[in-house]
Amino acid sequence: MGPSRSFQNLLLLLLPLALALCSAAASGEASRRFWVENDTFWKDGAPFQIVGGDVHYFRIVPEYWKDRLLRAKALGLNTIQTYVPWNLHEPKPLSWEFKGFTDIESYLRLAHELDMLVMLRVGPYICGEWDLGGFPPWLLTIEPTIELRSSDSTYLSLVDRWWGVLLPKIAPLLYSNGGPIIMVQIENEFGSFGDDKNYLHYLVEVARRYLGNDIMLYTTDGGAIGNLKNGTILQDDVFAAVDFDTGSNPWPIFQLQKEYNLPGKSAPLSSEFYTGWLTHWGERIATTDASSTAKALKRILCRNGSAVLYMAHGGTNFGFYNGANTGQNESDYKADLTSYDYDAPIREYGDVHNAKYKALRRVIHECTGIPLLQLPSKIERASYGLVEVQKVASLFDVIHNISDALKVAFSEQPLSMELMGQMFGFLLYTSEYQEKHSSSILSIPKVHDRAQVFVSCSHGDVRKPRYVGIVERWSSKTLQIPSLSCSSNVSLYILVENMGRVNYGPYIFDQKGILSSVEIDGIILRHWKMHPVSLNAVGNLSKLQLIMQMTDAEASKVSIYGDSENKLQDVSLYLNEGISEEPAFYEGHFHIDSESEKKDTFISFRGWNKGVAFVNNFNIGRFWPAIGPQCALYVPAPILKPGDNVIVIFELHSPNPELTIKLVKDPDFTCGQ
């Protein structure tokens, strides 16, 4: 027998084995199925209990995604739940972002690699203590005004466009396609907002168009009749999950849940089991007892119910993306902290060596039999110590340098920040009025959210604008302005801060800036000039120190309160005149010797007032120790570097008199108390 004949015989012998292997592989792929039957979740033919937790990719630096997921897995979780914020992925119309913090596909694939399942909450509304509930703020500029979270045709067309980009990206990652996604949530707690079922039906139609019929769609609503009646759509075969206070008896609520699911399709699921709670500025930090939280979870898991911890790991509201809440009216406004620690078992900086993590971990093991993995190592943190800062410039000195001339606008009436294209941060409004001999009364009936008011003489005045006071959304809307005895008109400067858009409730259409007329002694001011304050290039702020070496004439060109006919005194005189009540930029530096010395740290702002901070051009968020409770901002190690590290601070009022900050190891939520 020749060599070729032997090879043919070998192929004949191996062919049945190859066919069998292919068949087995195909069968295995086909068996990848997740569904609900007999009021039980099933995965690949076996009953399955969801032990999940929310871990939001957009609240964690991407370098830490794997670390946080591993800590969630060591807690005993088999499933990760996350929102998808539209405003991060489409910050401008048709401008799509899916890199870095927004690389959701990489995050989902990473969960899959770690053998974790995913429940994906695609919105379009997410709530989540996130700016505008995840909606892009440019939606607020559309005319005629659209109605969010409704069957408004313009709104639906934009949702369709957004999902037409997002859903094809996640379709290959569905469980039936070999990926980790077992469930996809539409909307979020809609039953506590409205009852537009046509809107919900449309969302289901779009989701099915891109994701097919095999994926389990679900809704989440509060465990009360009214919420479930308004927010569920069982006729579309959409699974209804519930959330409720951890102090509640879960099983009567799970029984109510059955009434809003098809018969046999109501596996008990709390899709938001609250491990802690949110905190607003001016409140004490919210905490919950570890033992009582663990007991509440045990009541669900030990009776084969399913639960998703909200949050398993909270993370951080970096940048300007924190949300806010309102009460009985839109003036009853409270903004969320930069920290989204949430008193979750995995702390903001990843710590798991705490009572809550250990208590929940024991309960999960006891009730489900999920093996206990080795407890993750402690997170290394560093105290880099005291850092001296120097004042770089007053905002008024450099407004023309950090305000895009093409975006400066003139209008008879003040324009909203959104209409100015300034979606986040700050906007400076300027106008003039004729002064009386006595003081005047300034009135701004509607400002969102916080305005600092300054005045100066329009001509012949080389001094900085004089600080008058604050007008806040939640308090008095009037200010008394003292007489300046000007020979000319008085220039009025109003710096407005967008502190975060409302993310929940009836006042979610939350435009920012001055949203009413402005009056002086009952007379409406007109002829406004608006300067968007761009903080995108704070890394170049040191260059603004060149202003200090400019000639008087050059300085007059860049000063908002100078005119070309007036010679200003050397700007350095003002930059070194000491501590004053004005918005200004400060800069500090600290050195890290090597890559191995890079550690997580916190910047303590005790002694400072209110503002926003950047580390190596990364916006680590807002600080407001004057009212607390958060004193220190989290700085994850990946944004640091060996060598020189630069901290830029935009302080709205006055800095620590010693012009120092401190880099410390631990978080601190004791300010303002």
Curated annotation (Swiss-Prot):
One of its GO terms (cellular component) is apoplast. One of its GO terms (biological process) is galactose catabolic process. Its main location: secreted. The keyword Glycoprotein applies. SUPFAM superfamilies: (Trans)glycosidases, Galactose-binding domain-like. Residues 1-20 form the signal peptide. The keyword Membrane does not apply. It catalyses: Hydrolysis of terminal non-reducing beta-D-galactose residues in beta-D-galactosides. It is an enzyme of class 3 (hydrolase). Glycans are attached at residues 38, 230, 304, 329, 401, 489, 540. The active site is at 189 (proton donor), 272 (nucleophile). GO terms for molecular function: beta-galactosidase activity. Its EC number is 3.2.1.23. Keywords: Apoplast, Glycoprotein, Glycosidase, Hydrolase, Secreted, Signal. It comes from the Eukaryota. It is found in: Secreted, Extracellular space, Apoplast. Belongs to the glycosyl hydrolase 35 family. This is Beta-galactosidase 8. It comes from Oryza sativa subsp. japonica.
